Amino acid sequence: MAKAKFERTKPHVNIGTIGHVDHGKTTLTAAITKVLALKGKAQFMAYDQIDKAPEERERGITINTAHVEYETDARHYAHVDCPGHADYVKNMITGAAQMDGAILVVSAADGPMPQTREHILLARQVNVPYIVVFLNKVDMVDDPELIELVEMEVRELLSKYGYPGDEVPIVKGSALKALESPSQDPNAPEYQCILELMDVVDKYIPTPQRDVDKPFLMPIEDVFSITGRGTVVTGRVERGTLKTGEEVEIVGFAPEPRKTVVTGIEMFRKVLDEAVAGDNVGCLLRGIQKNEVERGQVLAKPGTIKPHTKFKAQVYVLTKEEGGRHTPFFNGYRPQFYFRTTDVTGTITLPEGVEMCMPGDNVEMTVELISPIAIESGLRFAIREGGRTVGAGSVTTIIE
């Protein structure tokens, strides 16, 4: 069976549901597909189809994630829902599902709970830029003042973690009522909260800048010299575009970036005028010897990324079952940090008052690398020990 072609007619946005266990994330996800399916803009996915999400592996970590897609009049969405709390933590830290915005589901009957807090904090740490709130199960609360109270609590919690709590849109409704309704009319009253939510998502979560429009960056995977022509570096363009004749910087492993000009670009042995995000290319560099550039450095638009050695990061430590360590590690632990295409040794400093880090923990730490790497906030990495992955992290702040 031939695969359907992905028609890129509408802007694309990645979103996901976050929130405490049993507050209705998966029910809401199913309800969204149901209501939009009635409008011909989605395929209905039942609760069970979403709940028994297939396992995926991202950076050596097994994560259960359900991916659903749907459209509104304005945009095309890819929506992620995870069955278990640990799956969310792993998903957000590894960047397996990069979210442009999140729908925070809070039960009006219970109010914010520990995982509500943890998911908001994680969203903040891994740079989920926008959150909208769905206040679920409002049919189970008789007193409107209680609903207002929960709403205030949610806004305060969002503000506490650096989101604009006062302006975050909050939609109230019952995902279960929408999911169980027999009505085939998309404008039935029980579907209104879902339509209102999608309207808010359309308007409040901006369309992200596409990778192509960002400044050029290509992690270097391999280096060769071509007799009579010079040095060629190969890799996959991560973002931006590069034209023949443009100046780039080689960043990493040296305190200062080094400038050079790309005098030729090739893909599949054919000459290109321009490389764009996603292309696997070879770039011919002017005046660079083969021993002056290596795997693990990046080619970048001048001035857009700098080499750093010290940063703060949010890290998930793999459990023994996931192939991670069997024992905790302590302050001063020195594993390898795998950034893009290479490993660099670094030393870990745990937060004050934290003695050790257990397998399965989610922890903030400071890392100091032995050599500088092209790093920016939001960059993902794996922590490895003897070739196996023992953790996954995301850079939250650069120190030096």
UniProtKB/Swiss-Prot annotation:
Binding-site list for Mg(2+): 26
Residue ranges, annotated region (G3): 81-84
Stretches the record annotates as G2: 60-64
Binding residues annotated for GTP, in chain numbering: 19-26, 81-85, 136-139
Entry's Gene Ontology molecular function annotations: GTP binding; GTPase activity; translation elongation factor activity
Region listing for G4, in residue ranges: 136-139
Domain tr-type G as annotated: residue spans: 10-209
Enzyme class, spelled out: hydrolase
InterPro entries, sorted: EF-Tu_GTP-bd, EF-Tu_GTPase, EFTu-like_2, EFTU_2, G_TR_CS, P-loop_NTPase, Small_GTP-bd, T_Tr_GTP-bd_dom
Alphabetical list of Pfam families matching this protein: GTP_EFTU, GTP_EFTU_D2, GTP_EFTU_D3
Locations listed in the record: Cytoplasm
Protein's UniProt keywords contain Protein biosynthesis: yes
Reactions catalysed: GTP + H2O = GDP + phosphate + H(+)
Keywords, sorted A to Z: Cytoplasm, Elongation factor, GTP-binding, Hydrolase, Magnesium, Metal-binding, Nucleotide-binding, Protein biosynthesis
Region (G1) residue spans: 19-26
GO cellular component: cytosol
Region described as G5: spans on this chain: 174-176
Protein EC: 3.6.5.3
Function in brief: GTP hydrolase that promotes the GTP-dependent binding of aminoacyl-tRNA to the A-site of ribosomes during protein biosynthesis.
Family membership: Belongs to the TRAFAC class translation factor GTPase superfamily. Classic translation factor GTPase family. EF-Tu/EF-1A subfamily.
Subunit organization: Monomer.
Protein name: Elongation factor Tu
Organism: Caldicellulosiruptor saccharolyticus (strain ATCC 43494 / DSM 8903 / Tp8T 6331)
Gene: tuf
